A protein has these predicted regions:
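Conserved "HGTGT" condensation-loop signature of ketosynthase/thiolase-family condensing enzymes
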Residues: 1-83, 102-105
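Active-site-proximal gating segment of KS-fold condensing enzymes and close homologs
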Residues: 83-105
Length: 105
């Protein structure tokens, strides 16, 4: 089993990016009359952020990374470790983490 150890690690910042477009679940055309309210009450999900067609999780993460680097006034080549967390993948191969790492070069 392989292990990775990185000494002297510190978290200096954390970033996330959410799309600006918001879709109200009550307005979705998939629900019949009264059904939207029932689903919203059961799930607690009233609205969601929606990306434009063709936008990927990687696009959002890249925007968050660039904003964080700008706010911290860091150069891309000063990053030793990048942690990428997502519940979705945009490509089978290569994974988003490798693509994002390549964007740092």
């Amino acid at each position: 089993m392989a292990f990775l150890k990185i000494d002297n690690v510190a978290i200096r910042g954390l970033a996330a990016c959410a799309p600006v477009t918001i879709e109200e679940n009550a307005d979705l055309p998939v629900f019949e009359e009264g059904e939207a309210e029932r689903v919203i009450n059961q799930t607690g999900i009233v609205r969601k952020h929606v990306v434009p067609p063709g936008t990927t999780a990687l696009d959002l993460c890249k925007a968050a990374m660039e904003k964080l680097l700008e706010d911290l006034k860091w150069e891309k080549d000063s990053i030793d470790v990048l942690i990428f967390v997502s519940t979705t993948f945009d490509h089978i191969i290569p994974p988003n983490s490798c693509i994002l790492q390549g964007m740092l070069e």
